[in-house]
Design a protein with these regions (language model features):
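GIY-YIG nuclease catalytic motif and its immediate N-terminal context
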Residues: 1-66, 70, 75-86
């Protein structure tokens, strides 16, 4: 299984990615091992979606990185805690 995930830090910054191991990937970001998230504080998962193939996950990741995708993320965050689908 593959996950598409959205992280948010205390400053309100958003990071969108995909992985096979979501917990390991969150640790990776919080230890500062990712160029984009390094030095930007603690990150938390605010949205996660599960897919059967990496191809599907990459497609969804790209969708979430569009204007409409970011609007979708903001609505999900606003309406509840950690959103999960799939």
């Amino acid at each position: 299984m593959y996950w598409v995930y959205v992280l948010k830090n205390k400053e309100g910054r958003i990071y969108i990615g995909q992985t096979e191991d979501i917990e390991k990937r969150l640790e990776y970001h919080n230890r500062g091992w990712s160029r984009y998230t390094k030095g930007k504080g603690e990150w938390e998962i605010v949205l996660k979606e599960c897919y059967n193939s990496r191809k599907e996950a990459i497609k969804r990741e790209k969708e979430l990185k569009t204007g409409k995708g970011r609007e979708y993320i903001k609505e999900k965050i606003k309406n509840r805690g950690v959103a999960q689908s799939g």
